[in-house]
Regions:
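Active-site-proximal specificity loops/subdomain of glycosyltransferases
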Residues: 2-37
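Short, surface-exposed amphipathic charged segments that create phosphate/polyanion-binding patches used
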Residues: 14-25, 86-90, 160-166
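Active-site phosphate/pyrophosphate- and oxyanion-stabilizing loops and adjacent acidic/basic residues
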Residues: 32-36, 59, 133
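Conserved PLP-enzyme active-site core in the AAT-like
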Residues: 42
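Short aromatic/hydrophobic "clamp" motif used to bind/position activated sugar donors
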Residues: 45
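Catalytic metal- and UDP-sugar-binding loop of GT-A-like glycosyltransferases, i.e.
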Residues: 48
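Conserved donor-nucleotide/metal-binding helix-loop-beta segment in metal-dependent transferases, i.e.
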Residues: 52-85
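Catalytic core and acceptor-binding pocket of nucleotide-sugar-dependent glycosyltransferases
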Residues: 72-79, 92-174
Length: 174
């Protein structure tokens, strides 16, 4: 089912809790409040950015077993220096937040919204992608990495396979 949710009350409450720059609108943080916005009987949710193009059946994605994870997503290319800067650490995956499968039961158990707010207010000024960075840092020990087919980002399409392997294995992109 496709459900539209009015998040205006949530956004108004966030304004008093989250300090953010004008560069990122408050609405970017709404997905951090999914457990508050959605009824308790919803156990899992598939989040997709509005610019996502679906080319095939997504049932396999929906049926991914995430019972032991907070979130599932596809790896994003992020250099190790940036991962360390945001407090993630080199050994942890960094996933793209454009397509995410959230385990709402696990997130409710750990009061995830408070962790999100605390991190944004403490370290948010060093984040390039605040909502994506927060998801990666807070959930770093409970991320399931999904196959790339579930979220192919455009920079992957401009490379030959050999070039992409070099790009992915680089420790310095600049």
């Amino acid at each position: 089912n496709l459900i539209f949710i009015d998040a205006s009350n949530c956004i108004n409450r966030m304004r008093g809790k989250i300090r953010t720059s004008n560069e990122w609108p408050m609405v970017a943080f709404v997905r951090l409040y999914l457990t508050e916005l959605l009824p308790n009987d919803i156990e899992k949710i598939l989040y997709m950015d509005c610019d996502t193009i679906i080319c095939d059946d997504i049932c396999d994605l929906w049926n991914e077993d995430i019972t032991e994870y907070n979130v599932a997503g596809v790896l994003d290319c992020m250099d190790d220096n940036y991962k360390e800067k945001i407090g993630l650490g080199i050994g942890h995956p960094y996933i793209n937040s454009g397509v995410l499968l959230f385990n709402l039961n696990k997130l409710r158990d750990i009061n995830i919204e408070k962790e999100f707010v605390d991190l944004v207010n403490k370290r948010g000024s060093c984040f390039k992608y605040p909502d994506q960075d927060v998801i990666n840092v807070v959930m770093r020990d409970s991320i399931k990495v999904l196959p790339m087919k579930y979220n192919v980002v455009s920079q992957c399409l401009g490379f030959k396979y050999e070039e992409y392997v070099i790009y992915r294995n680089s420790s310095n992109y600049y």
